[in-house]
Design a protein with these regions (language model features):
Chain A
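Intrinsically disordered, low-complexity terminal regions
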Residues: 1-42, 47-49, 129-131, 136-137, ...
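Feature marks extracellular polysaccharide-active and adherence modules
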Residues: 34-36, 53-57, 64-65, 74-76, ...
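Beta-strand repeat architectures
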Residues: 20-30, 40-50, 61-69, 80-87, ...
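Short loop/beta submotifs within extracellular cysteine-rich repeat domains
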Residues: 60-61, 79-80, 98-99, 117-119, ...
């Protein structure tokens, strides 16, 4: 039996407090949250392997800093969905605004629609799979983890990125500083297939993707790179 | 034939004459010439630690009036002068209670060694005040040894996680710092050890340049929601500070209040840094004294003075600095460079070691190089092992107590039974610049430049 929570009757604070009471408990229950109506900071700081279904659009920072929970947003997500996620799975059935998965350290973020600019900015180990397109400056300063884009990528993809790996099936408007295309080896195809399986994305063949990563030329100060600074 | 003695005498005369005829350029003094030569040799800007070294108007340009016929002083040892501070009374369910009006500013593990961070926690805890993490996450050492620990949320989000958020006593959203308003963090490869790299999720040995803007909010409207998220994650328990570098301070303070800050932390241009371009340190931002006045004016205009608390930092060295900052309207001050000096930085006993790395006690500012002979600003295990965190903590506690005693001395002299009762009317300025910046009258006059009388 799912726990029903109606945000027309109770507040964001009451929702988060109720979820946090289960933090560290290992509870695997199911929660159905109705009428989110674009509210901000829903289901943030959850630390239990709950299954949470949010039935509608959400505002800023939904599922922020998530640990263990499987959170599905049945709608669109505002800025910073799953920001700084540590683990678990966050799925957006619609599209996501800016900075989706920003600085996230782990877990899996799936966006079934499109993601706006700065998707995966400063990502630190999270895996992000976007079925549609991503906007400009995606994977900016991305440190580690994988970003998979089934559609096209906007300008300055992977600017100043570190060790994150970026896979794009469509076109790339432009690459950011120090981001270069790298060969797709078998191990990368396997990694990509694994990620798409995990994300439940079908209809995209790993062979159609290109791989991008850091040229590592900006890792240490070098006068000869002054034009890139 | 001149004798040897005569020749030596005439050489000395020539040298002496030459010296008096040598004229150093005001525009191109030796330090400027040396910097041009260094730039031409290396092709890269100068990076260093410490804070601004140029001469600027400071709290030294202000004086307390004291008490006499028109005001009563308090007895030095018999009448109590309280120093406690409460931070976070606006929204936080668990405000911070400090025994003294001096806190320890954010300095990262990475910039500092683990035992140095531990010492900061030990010293602050003995003295009854808080210490702060930095751009690199929270170490178990500093959490264990800090009774009150402020956890910084920085643009890089290195090491940021919800467990440490919950473990923190307060959260500080860092928008900027006084040494470099508008600049991000910097940690050069020499200090990216395996442990630092792991905490920050970076490859070891790279020159880390942190982002200067937050990744998931832009502007005060977004920040308001970001702060709401932090409060939701931590059950509205913890005070949320917003730290700004002194720039357009009046507006920045007002916007921090609008964004929902419990506490505004204002860092003036003298504020320290572990590693920043010298040109940034010396040429961006405004001094602590005028910035403080602007921040207090913004709070007063919003009727938020003493409701949103104000912590000011940047060049605080003595109890006189503390008392003057409080008199101008701050609720507390914060120390960074002075705390490191209390731990042992720039110790004259280590002159030979400083000479070996091309510096000298009293001048050492190459904190970014990680070769600190005191073991404070390094990630070299052998150097760090030289530093005794227990002794360092004791020295910091001593220094914090001296600052507090000096502050009380000045407060009593002005007839105040709480350091927060100090007020701008207790101050005068020694220079026209300081009078204009602090908006207190030039000593012996009722003149505040730029202030028309009604």
């Amino acid at each position: 039996m799912a726990v029903e929570f109606d945000l027309r009757q109770k507040s964001t604070r009451e929702l988060n407090a109720a979820l946090h009471r289960l933090n560290g408990s290992g509870d695997t229950g199911t929660w159905r949250i109705r009428n989110p109506h674009g509210l901000h900071t829903l289901a943030v700081g959850v630390d239990a392997p709950l299954t949470i279904d949010i039935e509608g659009h959400v505002g800023y920072y939904c599922a922020g800093m998530n640990k263990y929970a499987r959170i599905t947003i049945h709608g669109n997500a505002g800025p910073g969905v799953a920001e700084n996620m540590m683990s678990g799975v966050v799925r957006v059935t619609g599209s996501a605004s800016q900075y989706a998965g920003a600085t996230a350290h782990g877990g899996l973020l799936v966006i079934e629609g499109d993601a706006s600019s700065r998707c995966g900015i400063s990502m630190k180990g999270v895996d992000i799979v976007v079925q549609g397109v991503v906007g400009h400056m995606s994977a900016f300063m991305a440190q580690s983890g994988r970003l998979v884009v089934c559609g096209n990528a906007g300008d300055a993809l992977g600017d100043s990125l570190y060790e994150a790996r970026v896979y794009v099936r469509g076109t790339v408007a432009s690459l950011g500083a120090d981001c270069v295309e790298k060969p797709m080896k078998d191990k990368h195809k396997q990694e990509l297939e694994g990620l798409m399986n995990e994300a439940g994305i079908t209809g995209a063949d790993a062979a159609e993707f290109r791989r991008f990563g850091s040229a590592r030329t900006l890792y240490n100060f070098n006068v000869d790179n002054a034009d890139a600074y | 034939m001149p004798t040897d003695r005569k020749r030596r005498k005439s050489d000395r005369q020539n040298v002496a004459e030459l010296r008096t005829r040598l004229r150093e350029s005001a525009s191109f003094p030796r330090q400027v010439i040396a910097e041009i030569q260094r730039a031409a040799r290396t092709g890269i800007y100068d990076i260093r630690g410490f804070g601004a070294k140029r001469r600027i108007p400071t709290f030294d340009d202000l004086l307390f009036l004291g008490a006499s016929m028109s005001r009563y002083p308090l007895e030095g040892y018999r009448e109590k002068c309280a120093t406690n501070v409460t931070l976070g009374t606006r929204y936080a369910n668990n405000p911070i209670e400090l025994k003294i009006p001096v806190t320890v500013a954010g300095m990262s593990f990475g910039a500092l060694s683990a035992p140095a961070k531990e010492a900061l926690g030990r010293g602050a805890t003995i003295a009854g005040t808080s210490t702060t993490t930095g751009d690199g996450g929270m170490t178990p050492e500093e959490r264990e040894h800090s009774k009150i620990l402020v956890y910084q949320l920085l643009p890089s989000r290195y090491g940021m996680n919800p467990d440490d958020l919950r473990r923190a006593d307060a959260i500080e959203v860092v928008v900027g710092q006084g040494a470099k308003p508008g600049g991000g963090g910097m940690l050069l490869g020499q200090k990216i050890s395996a442990r630092v790299a792991k905490m920050r999720d970076l490859p070891a040995g790279i020159d880390q340049r942190s982002a200067c803007r937050h990744p998931d909010w832009t502007g005060p409207d977004d920040l308001k929601i970001k702060i709401q998220e932090l409060r939701e994650i931590t059950e509205w328990e913890k005070p949320i500070y917003v730290k700004i570098g002194a720039a357009r301070t009046y507006y920045d303070t007002a916007l921090a209040v609008k964004a929902g800050a419990d506490v505004v932390v204002l860092d003036g241009m003298q504020g320290g840094t572990a590693a920043t371009q010298d040109v940034f340190i010396e040429h961006v931002g405004i001094p602590t004294m005028p910035a403080l006045r602007q921040a207090v004016e913004a709070l007063q205009e919003l009727d938020m003075h003493r409701k949103v608390q104000l912590i000011v930092s940047g060049g605080i060295r003595t109890g006189a600095d503390v008392a003057k900052a409080l008199a101008m309207g701050a609720d507390a001050v914060s120390i960074g460079v002075a705390a490191l000096i209390a731990l042992g930085d720039n110790a004259p006993e280590l002159e030979d070691d400083y000479n070996e790395i091309g510096s000298s006690a009293g001048y050492y500012d190459d904190w970014h190089e990680g070769r600190d002979p005191t073991g404070i600003s390094t990630q070299d295990d052998a150097l760090a092992a030289r530093f005794d965190p227990v002794l360092g903590g004791r020295r910091l506690a001593n220094y914090l107590r001296v600052l507090t005693l000096e502050t009380q001395t000045l407060a009593r002299a002005n007839g105040k039974s709480h350091v927060h009762s100090l007020e701008p009317e207790d101050l005068v300025a020694l220079t026209i610049e300081a009078a204009a910046m602090a908006k207190v009258p030039l000593a012996g006059t009722d003149w505040i430049p730029g202030h028309a009388k009604f």
